[in-house]
Amino acid sequence: MSISIPEELLLSDDDIPDMPDMLESEVVCALAELVGVLLIDIDIPDIELLPIDILAIDDIVDANVLLALDIASMLIDDMLDNIVLLALDIASMLIDAILDATVLDALDMASIFMLLPIFIPSILNVKYNTLFFIFYSILPTNVI
């Protein structure tokens, strides 16, 4: 005995939005189990009740698809939040590294300026105090 189901009661491919394959297969398995349980309760000789049961199954399928889409969107939101936080962490680490390198470069430059008065007198054979005074009088005040 074959049972024909009216076309307007069936879901088309356009009614169900696309989902990731893994999530879709889990939803399909869950729906198959649910539909199987509901179909057992259908009394086959009462053909008049069959469309009502199919409508109930259709509503359950729609609700499960919407629930699956909600879960998928929450998972995607969590992934995006984690990616944004990771990107911000990486950006802050890079900024810290750049600032550290800049500070180290500034300290290197300051140490070079501080050591110059010590080495120049030996090269030029000039008294240390005189050159020290001349060198620091030439430098701007914010460098000292």
Curated annotation (Swiss-Prot):
<keyword id="KW-1133">Transmembrane helix</keyword>
<keyword id="KW-0812">Transmembrane</keyword>
<feature type="transmembrane region" description="Helical">
    <location>
        <begin position="49"/>
        <end position="69"/>
    </location>
</feature>
<feature type="transmembrane region" description="Helical">
    <location>
        <begin position="27"/>
        <end position="47"/>
    </location>
</feature>
<dbReference type="GO" id="GO:0016020">
    <property type="term" value="C:membrane"/>
</dbReference>
<feature type="transmembrane region" description="Helical">
    <location>
        <begin position="83"/>
        <end position="103"/>
    </location>
</feature>
<protein>
    <recommendedName>
        <fullName>Putative uncharacterized protein YPR123C</fullName>
    </recommendedName>
</protein>
<feature type="transmembrane region" description="Helical">
    <location>
        <begin position="106"/>
        <end position="126"/>
    </location>
</feature>
<keyword id="KW-0472">Membrane</keyword>
